């Protein structure tokens, strides 16, 4: 994951100091892309320990179409707590848009199921896209989608995925986002009887928060270690039937974790 450290250094060297919605302040770049060959290892940051439990359970929560934090709390995952209301509700965030996008005619669109169907039956389509950026419902969401739009691409028996992330907290959020969409690509490939290709991450406002600078310096002082491998222990009947126990990360040997405050 040298490319991740390179991005951090590029922000420090070339970024612009900006204000932001949270009032914290950032150093920011606009427009950056990284590519990960998923056959060469699972792209999980090794220069600090990442909380795998949160990454996996959050993705399963998205795929279930859930928008209440109750399931996450049951699994010991607190990453959405700061944005939830007193009942744990978040409004129509990712899970709602992925699984039940409201159409103008009153229909509900399951974008994930449609993507699976297109990959299987129309793999050359240039429209295998899932969007969480529903302009008509942004005001109802506790947090507007940061990882907003992703597209699948099939070539030579391999499935690739590209994510567009409009806003990216590089220190805290980006390692989660890369791992989450890499995991989703593996799952979709398995369901569609394909090998994995590349995960391409494209960022818009790519930033380091001003209160993450010491943590960033510590991480930049560390040498990346070999990437782990992902093992999926079974093939469920559908993309929606995976369980936490189905996944194992092999050979993950990270440096110690680094704590940092979340900008709310």
From Swiss-Prot:
Residues annotated for (6R)-5,10-methylene-5,6,7,8-tetrahydrofolate binding in this entry: 51, 169, 263
Keyword Cytoplasm: yes
Residues the entry annotates as binding dUMP: 21, 126-127, 166-169, 177, 207-209
Record-listed E.C. numbers: 2.1.1.45
Chief site of localization: cytoplasm
GO CC field: cytosol
Record's keyword terms, sorted: Cytoplasm, Methyltransferase, Nucleotide biosynthesis, Transferase
A single BP term in Gene Ontology: dTMP biosynthetic process
This protein's pathway: Pyrimidine metabolism; dTTP biosynthesis
GO MF, any single term: thymidylate synthase activity
Catalytic machinery residues: 146
Catalysed reaction equations from the record: dUMP + (6R)-5,10-methylene-5,6,7,8-tetrahydrofolate = 7,8-dihydrofolate + dTMP
Keyword Endoplasmic reticulum: no
Subcellular location: Cytoplasm
Alphabetical list of Pfam families matching this protein: Thymidylat_synt
Family (UniProt): Belongs to the thymidylate synthase family. Bacterial-type ThyA subfamily.
HAMAP family to which the protein is assigned, alphabetical: Thymidy_synth_bact
Subunit comment: Homodimer.
Biological function: Catalyzes the reductive methylation of 2'-deoxyuridine-5'-monophosphate (dUMP) to 2'-deoxythymidine-5'-monophosphate (dTMP) while utilizing 5,10-methylenetetrahydrofolate (mTHF) as the methyl donor and reductant in the reaction, yielding dihydrofolate (DHF) as a by-product. This enzymatic reaction provides an intracellular de novo source of dTMP, an essential precursor for DNA biosynthesis.
Protein name from the UniProt record: Thymidylate synthase
Organism for this UniProt entry: Aeromonas salmonicida (strain A449)
